[in-house]
Curated annotation (Swiss-Prot):
This is DNA-directed RNA polymerases I, II, and III subunit rpabc1. Disulfide bonds: none annotated. InterPro entries: Arch_Rpo5/euc_Rpb5, RNA_pol_Rpb5_N, RNA_pol_Rpb5_N_sf, RNA_pol_subH/Rpb5_C, RNA_pol_subH/Rpb5_CS, RPB5-like_sf. One of its GO terms (molecular function) is DNA-directed RNA polymerase activity. DNA-dependent RNA polymerase catalyzes the transcription of DNA into RNA using the four ribonucleoside triphosphates as substrates. Common component of RNA polymerases I, II and III which synthesize ribosomal RNA precursors, mRNA precursors and many functional non-coding RNAs, and small RNAs, such as 5S rRNA and tRNAs, respectively. Pol II is the central component of the basal RNA polymerase II transcription machinery. Pols are composed of mobile elements that move relative to each other. Keywords: DNA-directed RNA polymerase, Nucleus, Transcription. HAMAP family: RNApol_Rpo5_RPB5. GO terms for biological process: transcription by RNA polymerase I; transcription by RNA polymerase II; transcription by RNA polymerase III; transcription elongation by RNA polymerase I; tRNA transcription by RNA polymerase III. Pfam families: RNA_pol_Rpb5_C, RNA_pol_Rpb5_N. One of its GO terms (cellular component) is RNA polymerase II, core complex. Belongs to the archaeal Rpo5/eukaryotic RPB5 RNA polymerase subunit family. Gene3D superfamilies: RNA polymerase, Rpb5, N-terminal domain, RPB5-like RNA polymerase subunit.
Length: 197
């Protein structure tokens, strides 16, 4: 029972993450029946982006505590069948070193993005914490407008690492610019921009 409650919380955080990344969440995904939590594989989700139906994502929940290369290959084949270019793998414990290497190879060769999150990382939605400011991913047009307005180069922007927890939550990759809105006692709100490196 405790395991089901844990999975419910993880699934809720994943749905919030997909929604924040602007993927369409169906009513079925939101009201997923509790009885279906028998197997983690049943929790697999497929979503498409609101403004671009060709941009799709899979979320996999492997049954085994440690994920190996064979499972990674299986997930890549599933992605190829639906022409998905991005996936999130939610692992119970860890991913084997060979599987990590396979993740990197598939990402380079097949032009797909495979992200890995531990279940413990998804028990709490970090963006809902009071100390984490609001992050907004800028489009290419908004990024160009920002650089021309302030007459600066991309390299002059402050940086955020790709392995930063919030950057991972939003699925940022190199070159993305994020707008960070913080509350300020003197100015009302304080806006900064960061380049993902």
């Amino acid at each position: 029972m405790e395991d089901i409650n844990r999975l419910l919380q993880i699934r809720k955080t994943v749905l919030q993450m997909l929604s924040d990344r602007e993927y369409i969440i169906t009513a079925y995904e939101q009201e997923y029946p509790r009885e279906s939590f028998v197997s983690r594989e049943n929790l697999t989700m497929y979503c498409v982006k609101k403004d671009d139906p060709t941009d799709s994502i899979y979320v996999f929940f492997p049954d085994t505590p440690k994920v190996g290369v064979t499972q990674i290959k299986k997930y890549v084949d599933i992605m190829k069948d639906r022409q998905a270019n991005r996936a999130i793998i939610v692992v119970q414990q860890n991913i084997t070193p060979f599987a990590k290497q396979a993740l990197a190879e598939f990402s380079q060769e097949k032009k797909i993005t495979l992200e890995q999150f531990n279940e413990a990382e998804l028990l709490v939605n970090i963006t809902h914490h009071q100390l984490v400011p609001k992050h907004i991913l800028l489009t290419k047009e908004e990024k160009l407008e920002l650089l021309t307005r302030y007459k600066m180069k991309e390299s002059q922007l402050p940086r955020i690492q790709t392995n930063d927890p919030v950057a991972r939550y939003y699925g940022l990759s190199r070159g993305h610019v994020v707008k960070i809105v913080r509350p300020s006692e003197t100015a009302g709100r304080y806006i900064t921009y960061r380049l993902c490196v």
